[in-house]
Amino acid sequence: MEDNIMAGSTFGTIFRITTWGESHGKALGVVIDGCPAGLALDESDIQKYLNRRKPGTSSITTPRKEADEVEILSGTFEGRTTGTPISLIVRNTSQISKDYSEIASYYRPGHADYTFDAKYGFRDYRGGGRSSGRETIGRVAAGAIACKILEQLGVTICAYTRSLGPVEADMEHFDKEAILNTPTAMPDYVASEKAVAFLETVKKDTDSVGGCMECIISGMPAGIGDPVFEKLDANLAKAIMSIGAVKAVEIGDGCMVSRRFGSENNDAFCIEDGNIAKETNHSGGILGGISDGDSIIVRAHVKPTPSIFRTQQTVNNTPEEININIKGRHDPVIVPRAVVVMECMAALTVLDAMMVNMSARLDAMVDFYKKS
């Protein structure tokens, strides 16, 4: 194998996706292998998810305008999946590559310019190429299909913005409708208004901020995930850490558990409506890498947008130290548009785990094949 082959664009074991395309290329997309036949599917099922991540929808996102309209190229017939690979494409329509012409000669602080050059000896400098946030279009398109399958299995996934800079959502007044109806994707209208006002000042100050996203996976049956190297929480963490700007992931109570006694942190088991349940959920719905039947709680911490309109020090490829002023169209905060990406990566992970789990028990296999 040649050293400069770009691996790492494929995710999943059975429900397997490969994303492709660059920020300023002709198009981006995804190929999905392993989707079961018979799922009712059209572009509108996918488009509603892509609309949540597309740019240019508010004053706190990049002014780049893209329709991000998806087209299904293969894998469906008469409105249903055929079980063969599904290919989805979204064409770029608003590239302004001249904004990035100077970037070919230097490395932007906080971006992957230097590391891509170090690895491949060559890079697409226009908007970051494969390291751009637009790469997530393929993930969201595939995740939309995963979410539709999961709904039929009784599993729902809801991600939202927990905080933006110092502004936090009040979880005691959680309002699911607010997630889709605010520019911040916060479940709290009041906090969202405060966050927008804060972000406007950040934008005027030519700076950027980070934030925290949270995801709740409801309806997961107990017993999903594998021990040791294929733990469900480990795979969720990997999936969400693969989102470009995410720098930390927590499951359940996360970092807080390091300050507790075992007597405080253990979730007591109980019987609820005749079923095994827990009185608390500090574990975040996963024990030993396997789902315990409770809601799975995941948080992701996102760094500030690295492209800021201030003079910054860096080096060029001579190399020598220089000062730069970045041009282009950039978000003062990434989090609101990344929320749906987190939701879709969680969906891809748990659906794949549930499909893998079909082979875990002989009685389940016997029951299935005897019925069929």
Describe the predicted segments one by one.
Residues 26-38, 134-155, 230, 234-238, ...:
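Alpha-helical support elements that line or immediately flank enzyme active sites
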Residues 118-228:
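Glycine-rich, mobile lid/loop segments that gate access to catalytic sites or pores
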Residues 5-64:
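N-terminal, positively charged regions that mediate nucleic acid binding
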Residues 50-109, 113:
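Glycine-rich, N-terminal phosphate-binding loop and its surrounding beta-alpha-beta segment
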Residues 104-129, 312-330:
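Short acidic, glycine/tyrosine-flanked loop/strand segments centered on an H-E-D-like triad
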Residues 16, 307-372:
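Internal helix-turn-beta structural module
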Residues 20, 26, 206-321:
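Glycine-rich anion/phosphate-binding loop at the beta-strand->alpha-helix junction
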